[in-house]
Amino acid sequence: MANLADDLAATAAKAAASPSYKQLKEDFVSNLSGGSVVEIAQVCAVAPVVSLLWSALQARQTFFKPYNPLAFVVDFLLNVGALLLSVTLYSSVPLLLNILLLVPAAAVYFSLSDNPSARRKKPQLPPNAQSKASPGPPGALSTKPFLTNYRGNMMVVTCICILAVDFRLFPRRYAKVETWGTSLMDMGVGSFVYSAGVVASRPVLKERADGRSTPLATRLVRSLRHSLPLLALGVVRLLSVKGLDYAEHVTEYGVHWNFFFTLGFLPPFVALFQSALRLVPSYAGLAILLGVLYQVVLETTELKAYILAGPRTDFLSMNREGIFSFFGYLAIFLAGQDTGMLVLPRSLVPRDGAPGTTGSRRRALVLRLAGWSAIWITLYLLCTDYTYGAGLTVSRRLANLPYILWVVASNSALMLSFALVDTFLFPAFYKAQDAKAEKEAYHTATSRVLQAYNRNGLAIFLLANLLTGLVNMTVRTLDVGRIPTMGILGGYMAVLTGVAVGLDMYNITIKL
């Protein structure tokens, strides 16, 4: 009897000493150091390379028109499947995956005809685009295919990673870094904010085109209408995580804070900063100024030590990562808004001031994107280089100046890559003379899958979060092997894509 009691006591002690599954999951995403910037760039490069292959199929073979079930399957495999492979089975060899995608892209482009002149032949305009008699001239702003492809790919990768990170197949170096370093998911968070900034420039451009200015009070009221749904989602996520005893990574945003709160507080602060344009007439200038000031405060006060090692005794200290990193995300948003001011206007006048042809305006757009990419990359190198620069280290937890510059430089370069693909393979589609022709030309040059993700991005992101929670509550993700992991992730992305494309087909836009 005594032996039985001893055995039970030993078993109970062993169970108490062994970590719970929740603790194992929290440890699985904690204390990570990330990977190299070069490898992350190679993974990110898969998206524009896939765009090149898709565009070659469309420009040379009109493969995705009409958009039948086969076209959808190929569209899904390229724009979702290839990105899924880049962070799972090909995560250790992203350069190889890029090569495997480039080879068929080149083959498709050059195999159209044995006649060299036919190979260089530009895609023909759609019938509507060739007509100049259609009513309704296009407006001052346009929705460019390369911008949709960029934002759609960003959303696809984000949705993949938020679930894939819970499986062992997803490399730990791609998961969010604890404090110092770079990772793919750190880039993804910043890219989401940057992309939101790009599209947020549209109402500002409309105001300028109409020659009007909205008072600050009106801008604040409008911004609050955008903020309230996001803040409500943040509260719902907070209550669900606490109520379901879901695994948490406290040092990511804090005890109560989450990414929805960060997104929700951006609009009113951006509305305030718009008034500062009278002093600093550039969103990029405001972004750099804010980032530099924030970094100076981090380096010259106790703020950095407080964020990284302070006790959690009150609401501010419990959520210090989310609250103070907000300034970094605000700078990223403003930088994205500056890019939007560049890429959204229909006509970009060359530097010589002459109206120019369609080709010259498109070259001007690409050159200015290239110029800004070079500027951001140079600033990032000056900020992080130990020999010729400041020698600072990237920290997503702080959202410090190196992190801001890394995110903006990478996204500027990515957008430039998509713009080059667009310019090279679909130059003729931008000669449309009316709104109807331009719309048809846009659909011809844009992936239906990426267009669907771009159209209802925030709603799909919310659905992805719900499905991620559902999978984690029903599956012990740490115990799943490679093949079942791919099956779960593939099914999850198929559901998200099906919902996104279904909403797009029925012309439904969910605004949050």
From Swiss-Prot:
<comment type="function">
    <text>Probable acetyltransferase, which acetylates the inositol ring of phosphatidylinositol during biosynthesis of GPI-anchor.</text>
</comment>
<feature type="transmembrane region" description="Helical">
    <location>
        <begin position="364"/>
        <end position="384"/>
    </location>
</feature>
<feature type="transmembrane region" description="Helical">
    <location>
        <begin position="483"/>
        <end position="503"/>
    </location>
</feature>
<dbReference type="GO" id="GO:0006506">
    <property type="term" value="P:GPI anchor biosynthetic process"/>
</dbReference>
<keyword id="KW-0808">Transferase</keyword>
<comment type="similarity">
    <text>Belongs to the PIGW family.</text>
</comment>
<dbReference type="GO" id="GO:0032216">
    <property type="term" value="F:glucosaminyl-phosphatidylinositol O-acyltransferase activity"/>
</dbReference>
<dbReference type="GO" id="GO:0005789">
    <property type="term" value="C:endoplasmic reticulum membrane"/>
</dbReference>
<dbReference type="GO" id="GO:0072659">
    <property type="term" value="P:protein localization to plasma membrane"/>
</dbReference>
<feature type="transmembrane region" description="Helical">
    <location>
        <begin position="323"/>
        <end position="343"/>
    </location>
</feature>
<protein>
    <recommendedName>
        <fullName>GPI-anchored wall transfer protein 1</fullName>
        <ecNumber>2.3.-.-</ecNumber>
    </recommendedName>
</protein>
<feature type="transmembrane region" description="Helical">
    <location>
        <begin position="180"/>
        <end position="200"/>
    </location>
</feature>
<dbReference type="InterPro" id="IPR009447">
    <property type="entry name" value="PIGW/GWT1"/>
</dbReference>
<keyword id="KW-0325">Glycoprotein</keyword>
<feature type="transmembrane region" description="Helical">
    <location>
        <begin position="37"/>
        <end position="57"/>
    </location>
</feature>
<dbReference type="Pfam" id="PF06423">
    <property type="entry name" value="GWT1"/>
</dbReference>
<feature type="transmembrane region" description="Helical">
    <location>
        <begin position="70"/>
        <end position="90"/>
    </location>
</feature>
<keyword id="KW-0256">Endoplasmic reticulum</keyword>
<keyword id="KW-0812">Transmembrane</keyword>
<comment type="pathway">
    <text>Glycolipid biosynthesis; glycosylphosphatidylinositol-anchor biosynthesis.</text>
</comment>
<keyword id="KW-0012">Acyltransferase</keyword>
<feature type="transmembrane region" description="Helical">
    <location>
        <begin position="279"/>
        <end position="299"/>
    </location>
</feature>
<feature type="glycosylation site" description="N-linked (GlcNAc...) asparagine">
    <location>
        <position position="31"/>
    </location>
</feature>
<keyword id="KW-1133">Transmembrane helix</keyword>
<keyword id="KW-0472">Membrane</keyword>
<feature type="transmembrane region" description="Helical">
    <location>
        <begin position="458"/>
        <end position="478"/>
    </location>
</feature>
<feature type="transmembrane region" description="Helical">
    <location>
        <begin position="253"/>
        <end position="273"/>
    </location>
</feature>
<feature type="transmembrane region" description="Helical">
    <location>
        <begin position="401"/>
        <end position="421"/>
    </location>
</feature>
<feature type="region of interest" description="Disordered">
    <location>
        <begin position="118"/>
        <end position="140"/>
    </location>
</feature>
<feature type="transmembrane region" description="Helical">
    <location>
        <begin position="92"/>
        <end position="112"/>
    </location>
</feature>
<feature type="transmembrane region" description="Helical">
    <location>
        <begin position="154"/>
        <end position="170"/>
    </location>
</feature>
<feature type="glycosylation site" description="N-linked (GlcNAc...) asparagine">
    <location>
        <position position="507"/>
    </location>
</feature>
<keyword id="KW-0337">GPI-anchor biosynthesis</keyword>
